[in-house]
Amino acid sequence: MTVVSCEIQDETVVVSPLYQDDCDEERGDQECSERVVINISGLRFETQLRTLSRFPTTLLGDPRKRMRFFDPLRNEYFFDRNRPSFDAILYYYQSGGKLRRPVNVTMDIFMEEMTFYEIEEEAIDMFKEDEGMIIEVERAMPDNEFQRQLWLLFEYPESSGPARMIAVVSVSVIVISIVIFCLETLPQFREDTSANLPLSNHHTTNGTTLHKKPNLFTDPFFMVETLCIVWFSFEFLVRFLSCPSKPAFFKNAMNSIDILAIAPYFITLGLELAEQQEAGSEQAMSLAILRVIRLVRVFRIFKLSRHSKGLQILGQTLHASISELGLLIFFLLIGVILFSSAVYFAEADDPESGFSSIPAAFWWAVVSMTTVGYGDMCPVTIGGKIVGSMCAIAGVLTIALPVPVIVSNFNYFYHRERNDEETAVYTHVTCGQQNASFGEFKSTSDSRQSLTKSEDTEEDSCETIRLTHFNPFEHYTGKLTDV
């Protein structure tokens, strides 16, 4: 059963709330129970008008929007769209807002179909969460124009040419800082080693020879480090002063890494100034503290992730796979305790065995389960070798289980990044009807290069083709559909 012909006039005045048509009292029940036929590329679906009117802001729920696709000759709505996807679209109206992607429809095609039918954003966000997708959060920008320009320069390198130049300078300074951090540990450059100190730096107190530490301010590595810190501090302050939200700024992990990259220098500087008035034993203690603090400088390498898409994808993959990684560590912990205990009791009768205790066997169990096998500890008895074989096999199986999930997450983030890059390069022509506003009904066939269905019923319907699916003004996302 199809809708009556008077629906053409009635639908222009039927504007529905969320779950009820605004029908007249006399014929409300009759109109709300009317059935409508929807033709999707030759496959007909039949439903009630009140089912579609549950979501009046969507394409099918708004009578004026769907009127553009009404075929008065066949008394149906025609959409040249993907047919398998419409099962889920119609179920969205029937279930009151539930979206379930068909198994034979890819994610990109189903996302295009939801966009075409103007499904509500809240339902799309819930669908993305159910599919395990990360919802893109709109980037906040400062209200002040000058702050906005500074924020774009230092936070988004792809925004302009000067921003790319600043990113190149920042990456260069990071690389120089990491190289200096590594070179200063070479024996020929380590001035804090007593063998390399000149005689003038040795003095004797109460028969004990003390080594006077060279002046840090004359160290060329310290000078280069100072120049790098000047740039890091300038970059950090500019980004902090121009950020749109100060609390959100400190919650960002990358900004915490920036603080860790800058703080060791100032702590080192403070300890160096304090050491000049301390005794020799206190200097040795300060030197030990200083070495621990300098170790934090290695975290500067993570500053490169701000300018590297690959490191960002890796970080997103690890964050999305945190539950799988936790499960992997838990399984490894169980295996380490189990096999270290087994190998200890298997090797207990051998006096030359290196497994003196169960905690001492933890190291062997870890390197065996991870298939590293250093060989510094190995079983010598038959029982110990059997336990070692089982430990290696169990380690391979334990590590292999969560790997496909982690690889799947990496592929998702990698392909999403590639799609975002393609979106910025290519232009898009959709494969369905033009998604114009419902108020555009004037004759624009010459400018839009389209043919509209003739209202003259004497013409042959086969010669009046409606080509409303061509839109040269949208952007191509690199995605294909099967319609």
From Swiss-Prot:
Cited Pfam families: BTB_2, Ion_trans
GO molecular function, one term: delayed rectifier potassium channel activity
SMART domains: BTB
Residue segments, region Disordered: 440-459
Listed transmembrane segments: 166-186, 221-241, 253-273, 325-345, 354-374, 386-406
Lipid positions (S-palmitoyl cysteine): C243
Keywords: Ion channel, Ion transport, Lipoprotein, Membrane, Palmitate, Phosphoprotein, Potassium, Potassium channel, Potassium transport, Transmembrane, Transmembrane helix, Transport, Voltage-gated channel
InterPro entries, per the entry: BTB/POZ_dom, Ion_trans_dom, K_chnl_volt-dep_Kv, K_chnl_volt-dep_Kv1, SKP1/BTB/POZ_sf, T1-type_BTB, VG_K_chnl, Volt_channel_dom_sf
Expression sites by tissue: Expressed in oligodendrocytes and astrocytes.
Assembly: Heterotetramer of potassium channel proteins. Binds PDZ domains of dlg1, dlg2 and dlg4.
Family recorded in the similarity comment: Belongs to the potassium channel family. A (Shaker) (TC 1.A.1.2) subfamily.
Protein name: Shaker-related potassium channel tsha2
Organismal lineage: Eukaryota, Metazoa, Chordata, Craniata, Vertebrata
